[in-house]
């Protein structure tokens, strides 16, 4: 099976992130779930409610037991969160692990803007998820978040 076009799908996620309503207390993120070269679900920050994350929104569109998730790649413009400020919601890394998604592709790692020391990548890797980072697309993903102090 050929390697998927990571740049194509990450650019699709970046386009989705532009749909996120910009708010001062949250990142604008896009996410795409892909199986066998086909998009099966998408999401973006605050798509369905003010607290929903992009990965959460995409996963909520599928049955959590959908067998395709075990073959899926999740493209997210930002490292999936390992901790939520909204304590009543599962972190996105936990949702990815529960779904059995084997590959996560990100454009940039979460800075310490809202949560100190996000360990999403490390948590996923510790559980056998292959994480692919595309630093060459980080600037494009970050540009959508210029409303935040990313220093």
Which positions does each model-derived feature cover?
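Short, basic/aromatic recognition patches
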Residues: 2-24
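Secondary-structure boundary/capping residues
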Residues: 22, 26, 67-68
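Zn2+-dependent cytidine deaminase-like catalytic core
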Residues: 41-141
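Short beta-strand scaffold segments in enzyme catalytic cores
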Residues: 28-37
């Amino acid at each position: 099976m050929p390697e998927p076009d990571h740049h194509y799908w990450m650019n699709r996620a970046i386009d989705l992130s532009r749909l996120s309503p910009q708010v001062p207390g949250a990142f604008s993120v896009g996410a795409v779930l892909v199986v066998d070269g086909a998009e099966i679900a998408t999401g973006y920050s605050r798509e369905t409610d003010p607290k929903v994350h992009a990965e959460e929104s995409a996963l909520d569109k599928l049955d959590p037991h959908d067998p395709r998730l075990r073959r899926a790649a999740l493209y997210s413009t930002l490292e999936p969160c390992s901790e939520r400020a909204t304590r009543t919601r599962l972190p996105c890394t936990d949702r990815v692990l529960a779904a059995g998604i084997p590959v996560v592709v990100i454009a940039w790692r979460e800075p310490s803007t809202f949560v100190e020391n996000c360990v999403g990548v490390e948590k996923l890797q510790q559980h056998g998820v292959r994480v692919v980072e595309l630093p060459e697309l980080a600037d494009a993903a970050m540009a959508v978040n210029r409303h935040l102090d990313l220093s």
